[in-house]
Swiss-Prot record:
SUPFAM superfamilies: Multidrug efflux transporter AcrB pore domain, PN1, PN2, PC1 and PC2 subdomains, Multidrug efflux transporter AcrB TolC docking domain, DN and DC subdomains, Multidrug efflux transporter AcrB transmembrane domain
Stated induction or repression of this protein's expression: The ttgABC operon is repressed by toluene; this is mediated by TtgR. The ttgABC operon is induced in response to chloramphenicol and tetracycline.
GO terms, biological process: response to antibiotic
Organism: Pseudomonas putida (strain DOT-T1E)
InterPro entries assigned to the protein according to its UniProt record, in alphabetical order: AcrB_DN_DC_subdom, Acrflvin-R, MdtF-like
PANTHER family found in the cross-reference section: MULTIDRUG EFFLUX PUMP SUBUNIT ACRB-RELATED, PTHR32063
UniProt record similarity statement: Belongs to the resistance-nodulation-cell division (RND) (TC 2.A.6) family.
Protein name: Toluene efflux pump membrane transporter TtgB
Cellular-component GO terms for this entry: plasma membrane
Length: 1050
């Protein structure tokens, strides 16, 4: 094949140009992400039950729906949250690879079976089913710069004017508004109701009857009488639109003709649909809308589309109102991708310099460098065909591939120059002769390297997604590299290399290159003597190898484990929890103190603070608060002002708050898998011991975790039980007084809850009508005495006649996991420990809890547990594939052993480097480790292959091994050094994405240094030992035939 293109160099150029063109066009269309869709698909069900407690929601809604969800295909786990404000969310998480559209249809079908069994109030509110990830993509805020609009005004504007266009934006899965739109609020006065012998039920019935839209028909409608000349629509009664119209609703007509209207017993006016949440931006009145990404959607494209949507709405904002983005996860995506691109460019430059240092021929160096853009651009084309994206993982794989892909071109150029020097052939003929000698080896080495990485592509789960990104990218680059080495590089050699006379070399005799060559030759001589010594003293060095293997196993067991390294995402969360039963006013004081510290004491680090009262990731309620903290750009912050350093300082300050628990934490590396770094676990009531026992177990867990030196910031992702007033109805007494239970329940629901009646029209938009008791009539248990129920005789009976209450405790938020009641606990490893060690400690503590209490990992911890169980199998498969490929390549079962034995020599270096830098055994480390295995095997192949050929030509095992080492040392050092320096930019990276770059770069560099430095001494020993052990026949006398010297620049 190579001969064809050597004779037709323009053909080779055309192929190279087509590959680059296809790749360039693919880059323009490839989506850009920080990560691919690592999180498994999830479908969320959201329901509201107005006025219901968390327990009521769980019993009447959650369990009904959960029971119907059983039997859905590929369902991994189901979690739910029920809140005291009547809201509920069920999240069904599916196996990786499940089509989210299919999953949503299946969930919707199951939900249709459950809907008729749900309370009528829930069905009236509607049930939302969305494909959305768990975390927020960004928060869009509205802030009143001049204070002319209140938070309620801003929230109403968002819901009325912005919510719909935002929800229609491509990529938006779900959203949450921090505030509520206006509603017509009817505030009942119990004293006036009693005066007119009316009840809340009477008011609700009258409003429902008189605030209606009537379809009144037509005059002259078809079929019409002959000769009809008129057709007109009849406009009947319409929905009310103003507070005055509602005040005029007729409630009662007395016998004397006097009338009682709604305005006589209630205050009517526009107010918030609910008052649960309020927000501020840097201390100014604000409201916001948090957007969640649809499953599988592109974060950058969605964020860009949202910004365009807001830009189109801005001209219509009220005066003094400004749109802000107080929380945005996309800047880290562009920054991290940009950083890796810079790393890629730096790697190419460093590889070029190394090649020039060893080849010492500018034309030869240019030829090898020209293969880089062809292969890289071609790889982008393959990524587009495979449906991949440009993301951190594929770009890392590109960086790793650079050192691999130039290696093939180096082998071609180096061998052509050797043939010209030794045989005196012109470049074209020398290239033909050279390709006949090496094209088999090129294909063989590519197969071996592919064999190391291909098993990664077949693993499932979120870890499998990561592995596939690396595997497909590097293997694609390797395949293209071999094709380019067989097609394009020979054509370049035949046309660009200068001819050499027999015995002539390009290597310099004077200057820097002369000094380098002389010193390198001296090193080669010393290296030969060292190898000879090792081969004459096999046993001590084999024992030393055994010690290296033992050390590798010990380090593997000692190095901490993790899923992915932590990253500075440029954002920070702070979560506020005041004592159970605290008011919103009390919580706001703590929120203000937190904001003041961040904006003043951390002004060099913090860009903005968006605070929310009434909500945090643990739950909703007046005792909950939250802050979304945007940090300044990475280039404006030093290492001392990283998100982790800020979190530590902020946490120390928040410990001084006496009236609240405040936690500062950074988001995880993969935002789709949760809201916080560290671990995520559910304690489950698997034995049916009840809520109280589960709460006791949770408190025991938290107490033991607080004493552990391995864990830090361990906290419940829920709310503590708070005071609740248990109202008991004496049914017999109520019946004796002629009061029905239905009237009692309806009166309670309307007076103390917020009862939805129907809708009204406000400035052209449909909004809701709510009836509720006025605040002064529902502040304390004594206020219950102000409310009356009418009995069958028309008499007003006070609640005190048939009801009594007592204080108790109950949870404002209840969670379930896989069908049983559960409590979620979050935490992080203490400084110096990894998430793997923290998870092991959690399992130890959970094992000491009372019987009936189990635990389950979720989110990123679930994925980490899964990835840890896959690692041994992946490692074993990769080594097995290498062995089988080598066996096929050499047609021998014994020779591959000499190559496979080199694997621990690379692993030990990767482990030492990772350990010294305080990093963990995570997914990136494993990818780097497999790459190191492949490169170590490649270096061993270069020695073993030549030693085998020399031995077959009649050399002794000893002489064949030493001669092969001498011939291959220079190219091994050159290609290894090129690869190592190409990865150096990863290890010294800073800014966005630096954590993952360090994780992969450190292990690879450590592994390659040890694989190169140790392997060049041990590989000849392995070759001789294995060949001797398996009965390789020694020649009767040592023959020294003319062997082609495969020396770079010799």
């Amino acid at each position: 094949m190579s001969k064809f293109f050597i004779d037709r160099p323009i053909f080779a150029w055309v192929i190279a140009l087509v590959i680059m063109l296809v790749g360039a066009l693919s880059i323009l269309k490839l989506p850009i992400n920080q990560y691919p869709s690592i999180a498994p698909p999830a479908i969320a069900i959201a329901v509201t039950y107005p006025g219901a407690s968390a327990q009521t929601v769980q019993d009447t809604v959650v369990q009904v729906i959960e029971q119907q969800l059983n039997g859905i295909d590929n369902l991994r786990y189901v979690s739910s949250e029920s809140n005291s404000d009547g809201s509920m969310t069920i999240t069904a998480t599916f196996e990786q690879g499940t089509n989210p559209d299919t999953a949503q249809v299946q969930v919707q079908n199951k939900l249709n079976l459950a809907t008729p069994l749900l309370p009528q109030e829930v069905q009236q509110q509607g049930i939302r089913v969305t494909k959305a990830v768990k975390n927020f993509l960004l928060v869009i805020g509205l802030v009143s710069e001049d204070g002319s609009m209140t938070k309620d005004d801003l929230a109403n504007y968002i819901v009325s004017n912005m919510q719909d266009p935002i929800s229609r934006t491509a990529g938006v899965g779900d959203f949450q508004v921090f505030g509520a739109q206006y509603a017509m609020r009817i505030w009942l006065d119990p004293a006036k109701l009693n005066k007119f012998q009316l009840t809340p039920v009477d008011v609700k019935t009258a409003v429902a009857a008189q605030n209606v839209q009537v379809s009144s028909g037509q005059l002259g409608g078809l079929p019409a009488l002959p000769g009809t000349q008129l057709n007109a629509t009849i406009i009947g009664k319409t929905r009310l639109q103003t507070a005055e119209q509602f005040e005029s609703i007729l409630l009662k007509v007395n016998k004397d003709g006097s009338q009682v209207r709604l305005g006589d017993v209630a205050q009517v006016g526009l107010g918030g649909e609910n008052y649960a949440v309020s927000a501020q931006f840097n201390g100014k009145p604000a409201s916001g809308l948090a957007v969640k990404l649809a499953t599988g959607a592109n974060a950058l494209d969605t964020a860009k589309a949202l910004r365009e949507t807001i830009k189109g709405l801005e001209p219509f904002f009220p005066p003094g109102v400004k749109a802000v983005f107080p929380y945005d996860t996309t800047p880290v995506v562009t920054e991290s991708i940009s950083g890796v691109i810079h790393t890629l460019i730096e790697a190419v430059v460093l590889v070029f310099l190394v090649m020039y240092l060893f080849l010492q021929n500018f034309r030869a160096t240019i030829i090898t460098t020209m293969t880089v853009p062809v292969v890289l651009l071609g790889t982008f084309g393959i990524l587009a065909a495979a449906g991949f994206s440009i993301n951190t993982l594929t770009m890392f794989a590109m960086v790793l591939a650079i050192g691999l892909l130039v290696d093939d071109a180096i082998v071609v150029v180096e061998n052509v120059e050797r043939v010209m020097s030794e045989e005196g052939l012109p470049p074209k003929e020398a290239t033909k002769r050279s390709m006949e000698q090496i094209q088999g080896a090129l294909v063989g080495i590519a197969l071996v390297l592919s064999a190391v990485l291909l098993p990664m592509a077949f693993f499932g789960g979120s870890t499998g997604v990561i592995y596939r990104q690396f595997s497909i990218t590097i293997v694609s680059a390797m395949g293209l590299s071999v094709l380019v080495a067989l097609i394009f590089t020979p054509a370049l050699c035949a046309t660009m290399l200068k001819p050499l006379k027999k015995g002539e070399h390009h290597t310099a005799k004077g200057g820097f290159f002369g000094w380098f060559n002389r010193n390198f030759d001296r090193s080669v001589n010393g290296y030969e003597r060292s190898v000879g010594t090792i081969l004459r003293n096999k046993v001590p060095f084999l024992l030393a190898y055994a010690l290296i293997v033992v050390g590798m196993i010990w380090l593997f067991a000692r190095i901490p484990t993790a899923f992915l390294p932590e990253e500075d995402q440029g954002v920070l969360f702070a979560q506020v929890q005041t004592p159970a039963g605290s008011s919103a006013e009390r919580t706001q004081v703590v929120v203000d103190q937190m904001r003041e510290y961040l904006l003043k004491d951390e002004a060099d680090t913090v860009s903005s603070v968006f605070t929310v009262n009434g909500f945090n990731f643990a739950g909703r309620g007046q005792s909950s608060g939250m802050a979304f903290i945007m940090l300044k750009p990475w280039d404006e912050r030093s290492k001392e002002n990283s998100v982790f350093a800020l979190a530590q300082r902020a946490q120390q300050h928040f410990f001084t708050f006496r009236d609240a628990m405040v936690f500062a934490f950074a988001p995880p590396a993969v935002l789709e898998l949760g809201n916080a770094t560290g671990f995520d676990v559910f304690l489950q009531d698997r034995g049916g011991v009840g809520h109280a026992k589960l709460m006791e177990a949770r408190n025991q867990f938290l107490a033991k975790a607080a004493q552990s030196k391995i864990l830090s910031a361990v906290r419940p992702n829920g709310l503590n039980d708070e005071p609740q007033y248990q109202l008991t109805i004496d049914d017999e007494r109520a019946s004796a007084l002629g009061v029905t239970i239905a009237d009692i329940n309806n009166t309670l629901s309307i007076a103390l809850g917020a009862s939805y009646v129907n809708d009204f029209i406000d400035r052209g938009r449909v909004k809701k009508v709510y009836i509720q008791g006025e605040p002064s009539a529902r502040m304390s248990p004594e206020d219950l005495q102000k409310w009356y129920v009418r009995n069958g005789a028309g008499e007003m009976v006070p609640f005190s006649s048939f009801a009594k209450g007592e204080w108790t405790y109950g949870s404002p938020k209840l969670s379930r996991y896989n069908g049983v009641e559960a409590m979620e606990i979050l935490g992080a490893p203490a400084p110096g420990y990894s998430t793997g060690e923290a998870m092991a400690e959690v399992e130890r503590i959970a094992g000491e809890l009372p019987s009936g209490i189990g635990f389950s990992w979720t989110g990123m911890s679930y994925e980490e547990k899964l990835s840890g169980s896959q690692m041994p199998a992946l490692f074993a498969l990769s080594v097995l594939f290498v062995f089988l490929c080598l066996a096929a390549l050499y047609e021998s079962w014994s020779i591959p052993i000499a190559v496979v034995l080199v694997v621990p020599l690379g692993i030990i270096g990767a482990l030492i480097a990772t350990s010294l830098r305080g990093l963990s055994n995570d997914v990136y480390f494993l990818v780097g480790l497999l790459t190191t295995i492949g490169l170590a095997a490649k270096n061993a192949i270069l020695i073993v292959e030549f030693a085998k050929e020399l031995h077959e030509q009649g050399r002794s095992l000893y002489d064949a091994a030493i001669e092969a080492c001498r011939m291959r040392l220079r190219p091994i050092i050159m290609t290894s050094l090129a690869f190592i320096l190409g990865v150096v930019p990863l290890t010294i990276a800073s800014g966005a994405g630096a954590g993952s770059q360090h994780a992969i770069g450190t292990g690879v560099i450590g592994g390659m240094i040890s694989a190169t430095v140790l392997a060049i001494f041990w590989v000849p020993l392995f070759f001789v030992a294995v060949s001797s052990l398996f009965g390789s026949k020694e020649p009767e006398k040592d023959v020294t035939p003319e062997n082609p010297r495969y020396e770079a620049g010799q």
